[in-house]
Amino acid sequence: MIVPCIDLMDGKVVQLVQGRKKALEGDTPLEMLRKFGEFPEIQVIDLDAAMGHGENSALVEMLTVKARCRVGGGVRTADRARRLVDLGAHRVIVGTAAFTPALEEISKAVGAERVLVALDSKDGKIVVKGWREATDLTAVDVLHKLEPYCSGFLCTYVDKEGMLQGTDLEWFRQLREATNHEITAAGGITTMEDIRALTAMGIHSALGMAIYTGRLDLAELARLNVYYPPSVS
């Protein structure tokens, strides 16, 4: 499955490099939704909420009402997760809170089937708090322990995020061998060859910069989702 990304900051659709530097702005959120309507699921990340600088709840609500979305950004409590589901999110993405007791509370509040755990890796270690703080853990270390609380994992290879330089297929292969849960890959996915290799492993692809810069063709990507219903009905 191909999952296009809509990242929100200050009410706009943006793409960041390494989660820090803004590289470009996209069309309006509604226009991006129209462009992505043929895809089975859209990934919406509220960057302001993730960084603790406010939130874009009105935009998130508008997007989730109109399309099947997985939503992340600042999901640190059960109340926040419930609120996103109430707004219309199909699934919520939990990052930093996955390494606290809050994960179990979130899972109980909305159901494990509605939770995706974000595992972001830089220099081989999981990073949290907007990729600003490194841990001593690797993604493979924690996959099994987190499985009871989620339906899948969003795994980002931060080293190449937003850089259009390709991703680390071997890292994703190791993750695939470590869990039977759904995995969505992100970070540096740039070519159809990357996507085909991930698909062959049984891994979904979340795409941002490669779509927004035109490196990958939306129509060609949509055809890869022939077995999935569109997110916008």
Task: Give short role names for the model-derived ranges.
Residues 19-36:
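Short catalytic helix/loop segments, enriched in acidic residues and glycine
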Residues 35-37, 85-86, 146-147, 199:
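Non-catalytic positions within long, well-ordered alpha-helices that form the structural scaffold/packing
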